[in-house]
Amino acid sequence: QLTFTPNW
């Protein structure tokens, strides 16, 4: 399962 992970 791929989820959006912000790299901020």
Curated annotation (Swiss-Prot):
Cystine connections: none
UniProt KW Secreted keyword: yes
Post-translational modification Pyrrolidone carboxylic acid, affected residues: 1
Chief place where the protein resides: secreted
Protein name in UniProt: Hypertrehalosaemic factor 2
Top-rank taxon, per record: Eukaryota
One of the GO biological process terms: neuropeptide signaling pathway
UniProt cross-references to PROSITE patterns, sorted A to Z: AKH
Functional summary from the UniProt entry: Hypertrehalosaemic factors are neuropeptides that elevate the level of trehalose in the hemolymph (trehalose is the major carbohydrate in the hemolymph of insects).
Protein location: Secreted
Modified sites of kind Tryptophan amide: 8
InterPro entries referenced in this protein's UniProt entry, alphabetically: Adipokinetic_hormone_CS
Organism in which the protein naturally occurs: Periplaneta americana (American cockroach)
Keywords: Amidation, Hormone, Neuropeptide, Pyrrolidone carboxylic acid, Secreted
Family, as annotated: Belongs to the AKH/HRTH/RPCH family.
Any one GO MF annotation of this record: hormone activity
Annotated GO CC locations: extracellular region
